[in-house]
Amino acid sequence: MTNCTVLDWQGKEAGESSIDLKTAKESSAADLLHRAVLRQQAHSRQGTASTLTRSEVRGGGRKPYKQKGTGRARQGSIRTPLRPGGGIIFGPKPRKYNLEMNRKERRLALRTALMSRIPDAKIIKDFGSKLEVPKTSEIVALLKRVGIDSDVKILIILNKPSEIIKRSIKNLEKVKLISADQLNVFDLLNANSLVIGEDALSTIKEVYGND
């Protein structure tokens, strides 16, 4: 179990919370997280690259010039890979890059990644509840009050972020906002700093703590 200090919007202590999720063994955690990140990145690839082979490239079957007497190397087709505009040998074709990983492993990897970041995470009570209009400066000021530089990669996890909060964060290039039920291993490990809404922490326990 990991205990967390809850901060208010001004960056002052407002209570405590705790979270306890099942994680992978230390001996296998690194391998599990590595496979989970590889899988996520592989699934983001489009796999639409395609080239034409010598049978698909445009052109006739006519011999470009006679076999003998030209002093040049013999050629049987203008579609040969040896000629400019000819077919491609072993070129890419549309394919899926998906990597298999069973559900238990995926959830275990996610919980392991999350619990590894919780000790350094900032838990904020009523995140942005007092914002009446979108103000990026308010988000920057909050990050500064809790000791986070807005120039580093920051992941903000909220339960149900409002449109005001989304628009307030939108202009911050290195700040990413995701919902508590949409967590993924790559974002958790890629961020330099983690900010979690207190209500989002409850959702995380509910969604990911049942295994």
Curated annotation (Swiss-Prot):
Entry annotated with the keyword Ribonucleoprotein: yes
Protein name: Large ribosomal subunit protein uL4
Quaternary structure and interacting proteins, as annotated: Part of the 50S ribosomal subunit.
GO terms under cellular component: ribonucleoprotein complex; ribosome
Compositionally biased spans, kind Polar residues: 41-54
Ranges of Basic residues composition bias in the record: 60-71
Keywords noted in UniProt: Ribonucleoprotein, Ribosomal protein, RNA-binding, rRNA-binding
Gene behind the chain: rplD
MF annotations from Gene Ontology: rRNA binding; structural constituent of ribosome
InterPro entries linked to this entry: Ribosomal_uL4, Ribosomal_uL4-like, Ribosomal_uL4_dom_sf
Pfam families in alphabetical order: Ribosomal_L4
